[in-house]
UniProtKB/Swiss-Prot annotation:
Residues 2-81 form the GST N-terminal domain. This is Elongation factor 1-gamma. GO terms for cellular component: cytoplasm; cytosol; nucleus. Residues 86-212 form the GST C-terminal domain. Residues 219-248 have a biased composition (Basic and acidic residues). It comes from the Eukaryota. GO terms for molecular function: translation elongation factor activity. The keyword Nuclease does not apply. One of its GO terms (biological process) is cytoplasmic translational elongation. The keyword Protein biosynthesis applies. PANTHER family: ELONGATION FACTOR 1-GAMMA. Keywords: Elongation factor, Protein biosynthesis. Coiled coil: none annotated.
Length: 409
């Protein structure tokens, strides 16, 4: 009988870790694939921050945070000590799990996100990430030289979690030849992969020969029209020379042809800039909003677990995203804010856009795939309150203080 349900994307090493722990412990759980910050209403009511993974027991017991879920599921099997047996082993298991959870996501992100999610590629950040991974692997390789498992003489949560991140890296960037340089990790990965039942949960063990290519932003500009071929016709030689061809104009923005409606988004930008947000700009917006030709969207960063960084760095992430939205600026207005604190924060916000399809408004930014978009209804009190708070910045959002933010106008 199932003890509950794990919610989250199985492609996430953190979600895979929780599902794997249950499988190894012999504890039956269900898995439901959900996107971060796009939980169903009943699940969002239990977990307002909407970060994955989360767990709900059959009796309704709610639990969030990767390590808490994994340790709970492991503890349900009293005969298999996946948490460790002695006090010292339990402490070491927690040490390795904590290290994996805090260090590996940030190390992998600069080299995986541009290949999987289309995030901008930062060469300097990628080099620093590669150096960090090499240091981490060197440390683990040295430790594994004289032992089969990280802690004790049996499989523990420490092994399962580290191997889930090894699989994450080996799926996209860590080639067979790269892993083979770390002889003991290479052997360890193949051993633990099967013991952690990853072959049954996801796919058989395999290696890649080349990292996935970096996703390049599409070139939106039309190529110049080809010159007509010259014909060997004497009359053509005597014909008047045509004027030099001009490059074809770039295609219009997809939203340019959408109905303008009665809402003047440029006027609202001026109102927002010149009037108090609560007493002036927000009442103006709700009075003039045209729901037939415009829509409002909640924007959330899809990988908040990776933002273990200072607030200013997360705010810079918003700034870069907004810069890359330049081609859509005439058709959108919005704010994104950093909620939380240094070392534990995320991005959320609200945008009004022309039309009802968010894709053409945001896909001009190569990193738009790193965000989740949820349509809002201004007639719902909770949605209206979120828009107000996201644009006013003067109240906590989702239970967290607004630390900083930026306006796209």
């Amino acid at each position: 009988m199932s003890v509950g349900t794990v919610y989250g994307k199985i492609g996430s090493p953190r979600v895979l870790f929780c599902v794997s722990v249950a499988a190894v412990a012999g504890v039956e759980v269900e898995h439901v694939d959900v996107q971060p910050h796009n939980f169903p209403a009943d699940l969002a009511a239990k977990f307002p921050l909407q970060k994955m993974p989360v767990f709900v027991g059959k009796d309704g017991f709610p639990l969030s945070e990767t390590l808490a879920i994994a340790f709970y599921l492991a503890s349900l099997n009293k005969t298999r000590a996946l948490n460790g047996t002695t006090a010292e082993e339990k402490a070491k298991v927690l040490q390795y799990c904590s290290f994996t959870n805090s260090e590996l996501p940030g190390a992998f992100r600069p080299i995986i996100a541009p290949r999987v999610f289309g995030a901008p590629y930062d060469e300097q950040a990628a080099k620093e990430a590669e150096t960090a991974i090499a240091l981490i692997f060197a440390r683990f390789d040295e430790e594994l030289a004289s032992k089969t498992y990280l802690v004790g003489s049996r499989l523990t949560l420490a092994d399962i979690f580290f191997t889930c991140f090894l699989k994450f890296g080996a799926t996209y960037v860590l080639t067979k030849s790269y892993l083979a340089k770390y002889t003991h990790i290479y052997r360890y990965y193949q051993t633990i992969y099967h013991q952690a039942k990853l072959d049954a949960i996801t796919e058989p063990l395999k290696f890649i020969d080349q990292p996935l290519p970096i996703i390049k932003a599409e070139n939106k500009e039309a190529a110049p029209a080809k010159k007509a071929e010259k014909k060997k016709d004497e009359k053509k030689k005597n014909a008047p020379k045509p004027q030099a061809e001009r490059p074809a104009k770039p295609p219009k923005h997809p939203l340019a042809s959408a109905p303008n409606g009665s809402f003047d988004i440029e006027e609202y930008k001026r109102v927002y800039s010149n009037q108090d947000t609560r007493s002036g700009a927000l009442p103006w917006f709700f009075e003039h909003f045209d729901p037939e030709n415009y829509s409002v969207w909640k924007v959330d960063y899809s990988y908040p677990e990776d933002l273990k960084q200072p607030v200013f760095m997360t705010n810079n992430l918003i700034g870069g995203f907004f810069q890359r939205l330049e081609a859509s600026r005439k058709y959108i207005f919005g704010c994104c804010v950093v909620i939380g604190e240094n070392g534990d924060n995320t991005i959320t916000g609200a945008f009004v856009i022309k039309g009802h399809d968010y894709v053409p408004a945001f896909d001009v930014a190569p990193d738009w795939g790193s965000y989740t978009f949820t349509k809002l209804d201004i007639n719902k009190p909770e949605d209206k309150a979120f828009i107000e708070d996201a644009w006013a910045w003067d109240k906590p959002i989702e239970g967290r203080e607004v630390a900083d933010g930026k306006v796209c106008k």
